[in-house]
From Swiss-Prot:
It comes from Staphylococcus haemolyticus (strain JCSC1435). It comes from the Bacteria. It holds the Pfam family MecA. This is Adapter protein MecA. Belongs to the MecA family.
């Protein structure tokens, strides 16, 4: 499980289904068994608290997005002063109610995991619509961006991913000692392949809210055109 501290009140995590199974849960547990789903969310909160000191204080806002390879969860604490003064018991009860509501809504939804992922892709597309107007118009180009915490993660991805993306334009940026990898898929690639590629990239990297506009303005391009092949050329595999 990868945990990213967004700010003082928000954490984001991505956990693969294989990792979920290693923790004693199944993929079906999350969407068809409310009791097991609750156990899973509470176990995640315990681990987040242990690693990031993210204590349940007041109500939380939870967003869950299902991907083909796993689940992305964003958890935010309330910034409302009155809510922050809730007792621990009331806060826990409200959090449990939110988890129950979240699971209930999921169980009532007959759409598949793939449908939910497609919705997520559409949400991202709409959220970046205003920023896309500022970029140079490139017909039918769709961009995927992920973040690596260090160079070792970049190298690991370059050697061990199984994506056929070498024919597409790609860029490796650096900003604040973090690495951002962008792939521009052209019109020959289906949305399903893009979705699958993104979920596989998240096995090595993290989601990011940084856009291409932001990276072009504030980050430095350190590699371009067949980035993974260049990384393999200049750096040995760190995992033998």
């Amino acid at each position: 499980m990868r945990i990213e501290r967004v700010d003082d009140t928000t954490v984001k995590l991505f956990i693969t289904y294989s990792d979920i199974e290693a923790r004693g849960f199944s993929r079906e547990d999350l969407w068809t068994n409310r009791k097991r789903g609750e156990e899973f969310f509470w176990s995640m909160m315990d681990e987040i608290n242990e690693e990031e000191d993210f204590v349940v204080e007041g109500p939380l806002w939870i967003q869950v997005h299902a991907f083909e390879k796993g689940v992305e969860v964003t958890i935010s604490k309330s910034k409302n002063e009155e809510a922050m003064n809730m007792s621990d018991e009331d806060a826990n009860e409200q959090f449990e109610e939110q988890v129950n509501e979240l699971l209930a809504n999921t169980l009532e939804n007959e759409e598949s995991i793939e449908d939910l992922f497609e919705q997520r892709a559409q949400q991202q597309k709409h959220s970046h619509k205003s920023e896309q107007k500022q970029t140079k118009q490139r017909p039918n180009i769709r961009t995927v961006i992920v973040k690596f915490d260090d160079l070792e993660q970049v190298i690991s991805y370059a050697y061990h991913h199984n994506l056929s993306t070498d024919e597409f334009e790609d860029l490796l940026y650096m900003n604040d000692n973090k690495y951002y990898y962008a792939i521009h898929f052209d019109e020959s690639v289906s949305q399903e392949m893009i979705n699958d590629s993104y979920s596989q990239m998240l096995e090595f990297a993290y989601p990011t809210d940084k856009t291409e506009v932001y990276l072009n303005d504030y980050a430095k391009i350190i590699m371009s055109h067949n980035v993974t092949a260049q990384v393999r050329r200049y750096f040995p595999d760190t995992v033998e």
